[in-house]
Amino acid sequence: MKKTVKALAAYQAELPVETVKAKYGLQHLARLSANESVYGPSPKVAQAVRAVSDDILGYYPDGQATELREAVAKLNHVDPQHLVFGAGADELIELLTRVVLEPGSNIIIPNPTFGEYAMHAQIEQSTTKKIPVNVDNGNVDFDAILDAIDDKTAMVWIANPNNPTGVFETTSSIKRFLDKLPANITLVVDEAYYDFVDEPDATVAPLVAEYTNLVVLRTLSKAYGLANLRVGYGIMQDPLYSAMQAVRLPYNLSTYQIAGGTAAVLDQEYLQKNVQRFQVERQKFQDFLTKNKFKFYESQANFIWIKVGETKKVGQKLLEQGFQVNDRLNPEWIRIALGTPEDNAELKLAFLKATNK
């Protein structure tokens, strides 16, 4: 077994809602720890999945996810042959790391950010350089990343909006960074939460046509509400496209995933309705935090990163009141996803109580 794998700890997933409710004697639990959509997917998703014929169960699915590929390409105005599909963006993170990294190479990431980037680098026997975000506003320090590059640097990862901070980097700032980044270094912009952004030019996807070292990742797990179905995609040019197609499993999406994912992508009216709900609730909750003098980073995602002091104590107090949040990422900061308007209203009261305000 690889020494780098021996050093890893298994991911601690959220317990089932009913298990947590039973443990704490709760009538209602708002699960706000995994950045899921409380509104779920378009009703057309279930219709599409149910419409899949039982006759296909004995046959492998479409290995190119043709129907989904065409829908995603049209939505994003990209070449269908620039799309690689995976079981969520997680699979694509794993594959990109496998394709790009050699033992002894390194990646550069902001700190904090999504933990899987560093984990997969470790598996591939690469090291990770962590560059602190701006302490005042959470923005990525692109100049410090450029200064950290050496002859072993192979990848830079930018989650945009960032997870767990929710902070958004403009397309112009990323383009300036790309223009300074050596062409042999792959920049991956993980846009898992880009659907929630209410700023113009929310995506760098159009830049893929200009830069062969740029990859954009997307998922249907968040705004589209398909976390259980596991569908993600990457936008990239050759040679990365061909390499990713070569290493991915040949039938990595089932017919159910393809059908459900396609239905979700085609129902943009449902998506936008729910995104607007999240944007309204996000602003209301950030106004509440400002009014009560909490430090937080301005979010463009469906969650907020808040400084609370003793994170574990606050998280436990919230859980006892029926709100499951993510208190595992930082000893002083907590990440709370937005729930329904009703849950968010109750959460404000619970949050004041949990933080002794």
From Swiss-Prot:
Modified residues (N6-(pyridoxal phosphate)lysine): K222
Cofactors, names only: pyridoxal 5'-phosphate
Enzyme class: transferase
Pfam families (alphabetical): Aminotran_1_2
One example GO MF annotation: pyridoxal phosphate binding
Reactions mediated catalytically: L-histidinol phosphate + 2-oxoglutarate = 3-(imidazol-4-yl)-2-oxopropyl phosphate + L-glutamate
Biological processes per GO annotation: L-histidine biosynthetic process
InterPro entries: Aminotransferase_I/II_large, HisP_aminotrans, HistidinolP_aminotransfase, PyrdxlP-dep_Trfase, PyrdxlP-dep_Trfase_major, PyrdxlP-dep_Trfase_small
Pathway the protein takes part in: Amino-acid biosynthesis; L-histidine biosynthesis; L-histidine from 5-phospho-alpha-D-ribose 1-diphosphate: step 7/9
Complexes and interactors: Homodimer.
Family of the protein in this entry: Belongs to the class-II pyridoxal-phosphate-dependent aminotransferase family. Histidinol-phosphate aminotransferase subfamily.
Protein name, per record: Histidinol-phosphate aminotransferase
Organism this protein belongs to: Leuconostoc mesenteroides subsp. mesenteroides (strain ATCC 8293 / DSM 20343 / BCRC 11652 / CCM 1803 / JCM 6124 / NCDO 523 / NBRC 100496 / NCIMB 8023 / NCTC 12954 / NRRL B-1118 / 37Y)
Gene name for this UniProt entry: hisC
